[in-house]
C-alpha cells in the first residue's frame, strides 16, 4: 500500500472514530463513572467488536449482511434493543460513582462484554466498512496485506480516540463530587444511549 493512500485512510479513520455514536457515549459514561484505568476493559471491548466487523468484511460476510435486508434488520433491532436497555439501566442508576471510586457494580470483564455487544450489534459499522475498504485497496495487488493494514489502522485509531474520550471524561469526573450531579449525568447518558438505540432502529442498509 502506497504511503499517500494509507495517510488518506488514516485521516478517514480518525474522522470515523471521532464521529459521535454509541461507542463514544459508552466511553464518556465509563470515564465519568469509573475513571480511566477501570474503563480500559470497555475500550478493549469496543475494539474487539470493531475487529469482528472488520474480519466479517474481509471474508465477505459483511457484504452479505449489508445486502441482506433480513440480516441487517435482525442485527439492527437486537442492537437497538440492547442500547435502549443500557439506557434504562443508566437512567435508573441512583448510586453513581465518582471517577476516583472503585466500581463495585461492574468489573472490567463486565464492561468489556458490554462494549463488545455495543459494537457487535451495530450493523451500520459493517455497511460503512464494506463501502469504505474497497476505496483504498488496489485490486492489482495482493488483497490481504492491504486489508490487514487497513484493519490494524482502524482498530488502533479507534482505540486511541476512545481512550481520549474516556480520559477526558475521567478528568472531568474528578471535579464532580455531588451525588445529585452524578445522578443527573447518569440520566443524561441514559437518554443518550436510548437515543442511539432509536437512531439505530431507523437505520437503513
From Swiss-Prot:
<feature type="transmembrane region" description="Helical">
    <location>
        <begin position="5"/>
        <end position="25"/>
    </location>
</feature>
<dbReference type="InterPro" id="IPR001123">
    <property type="entry name" value="LeuE-type"/>
</dbReference>
<keyword id="KW-0812">Transmembrane</keyword>
<feature type="transmembrane region" description="Helical">
    <location>
        <begin position="41"/>
        <end position="61"/>
    </location>
</feature>
<dbReference type="GO" id="GO:0005886">
    <property type="term" value="C:plasma membrane"/>
</dbReference>
<comment type="function">
    <text>Involved in positive regulation of motility and negative regulation of biofilm formation.</text>
</comment>
<keyword id="KW-0472">Membrane</keyword>
<keyword id="KW-0997">Cell inner membrane</keyword>
<keyword id="KW-1133">Transmembrane helix</keyword>
<feature type="transmembrane region" description="Helical">
    <location>
        <begin position="147"/>
        <end position="167"/>
    </location>
</feature>
<protein>
    <recommendedName>
        <fullName>Uncharacterized membrane protein VC_0136</fullName>
    </recommendedName>
</protein>
<keyword id="KW-1003">Cell membrane</keyword>
<dbReference type="Pfam" id="PF01810">
    <property type="entry name" value="LysE"/>
</dbReference>
<comment type="similarity">
    <text>Belongs to the Rht family.</text>
</comment>
<dbReference type="GO" id="GO:0042970">
    <property type="term" value="F:homoserine transmembrane transporter activity"/>
</dbReference>
<dbReference type="GO" id="GO:0042968">
    <property type="term" value="P:homoserine transport"/>
</dbReference>
<feature type="transmembrane region" description="Helical">
    <location>
        <begin position="117"/>
        <end position="137"/>
    </location>
</feature>
<feature type="transmembrane region" description="Helical">
    <location>
        <begin position="68"/>
        <end position="88"/>
    </location>
</feature>
Amino acid at each position: 500500500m502506497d504511503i499517500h493512500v494509507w495517510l488518506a485512510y488514516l485521516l478517514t479513520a480518525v474522522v470515523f472514530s471521532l464521529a459521535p455514536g454509541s461507542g463514544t457515549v459508552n466511553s464518556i459514561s465509563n470515564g465519568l463513572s469509573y475513571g480511566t484505568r477501570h474503563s480500559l476493559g470497555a475500550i478493549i471491548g469496543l475494539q474487539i467488536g470493531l475487529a469482528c466487523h472488520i474480519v466479517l468484511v474481509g471474508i465477505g460476510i459483511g457484504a452479505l449482511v449489508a445486502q441482506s435486508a433480513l440480516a441487517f434488520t435482525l442485527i439492527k433491532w437486537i442492537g437497538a434493543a440492547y442500547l435502549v436497555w443500557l439506557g434504562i439501566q443508566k437512567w435508573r442508576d441512583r448510586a453513581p460513582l465518582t471517577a476516583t471510586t472503585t466500581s463495585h457494580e461492574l468489573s472490567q470483564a463486565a464492561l468489556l462484554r458490554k462494549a463488545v455487544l455495543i459494537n457487535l450489534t451495530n450493523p451500520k459499522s459493517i455497511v460503512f466498512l464494506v463501502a469504505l475498504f474497497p476505496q483504498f485497496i488496489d485490486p492489482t495487488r495482493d488483497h490481504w496485506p492491504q486489508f490487514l493494514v487497513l484493519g490494524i489502522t482502524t482498530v488502533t485509531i479507534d482505540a486511541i480516540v476512545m481512550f481520549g474520550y474516556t480520559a477526558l471524561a475521567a478528568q472531568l469526573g474528578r471535579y464532580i463530587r455531588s451525588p445529585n450531579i452524578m445522578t443527573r449525568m447518569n440520566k443524561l447518558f441514559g437518554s443518550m444511549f436510548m437515543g442511539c438505540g432509536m437512531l439505530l432502529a431507523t437505520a437503513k442498509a
